[in-house]
Amino acid sequence: MKITQEEVTHVANLSKLRFSEEETAAFATTLSKIVDMVELLGEVDTTGVAPTTTMADRKTVLRPDVAEEGIDRDRLFKNVPEKDNYYIKVPAILDNGGDA
């Protein structure tokens, strides 16, 4: 499946990213190769392979959910260039609060 430069540009715009024409062309080529590989994997005969089979021999180890003391707020805000009460002000990324 061929990914076009227009599709790369569209997704980049949704992500608020900008790329040069050369970068966009390179991304389109690379993404096309990745999609082709995924499609090729879809053709592999997995008859008799259990859906939950994994090659990794790992267990999920969860830690207990214990409240811990966080960062000292006043110390943190000493490094913040712009704040409003205890909120960190950052530049807007959406025009007029619009959607992505």
UniProtKB/Swiss-Prot annotation:
Transmembrane segments: none annotated. One of its GO terms (biological process) is regulation of translational fidelity. The keyword Protein biosynthesis applies. Its EC number is 6.3.5.-. It catalyses: L-glutamyl-tRNA(Gln) + L-glutamine + ATP + H2O = L-glutaminyl-tRNA(Gln) + L-glutamate + ADP + phosphate + H(+); L-aspartyl-tRNA(Asn) + L-glutamine + ATP + H2O = L-asparaginyl-tRNA(Asn) + L-glutamate + ADP + phosphate + 2 H(+). The keyword Nucleotide-binding applies. Keywords: ATP-binding, Ligase, Nucleotide-binding, Protein biosynthesis. One of its GO terms (molecular function) is ATP binding. It comes from the Bacteria. NCBIfam families: gatC (TIGR00135). Allows the formation of correctly charged Asn-tRNA(Asn) or Gln-tRNA(Gln) through the transamidation of misacylated Asp-tRNA(Asn) or Glu-tRNA(Gln) in organisms which lack either or both of asparaginyl-tRNA or glutaminyl-tRNA synthetases. The reaction takes place in the presence of glutamine and ATP through an activated phospho-Asp-tRNA(Asn) or phospho-Glu-tRNA(Gln). Belongs to the GatC family. Heterotrimer of A, B and C subunits. This is Glutamyl-tRNA(Gln) amidotransferase subunit C.
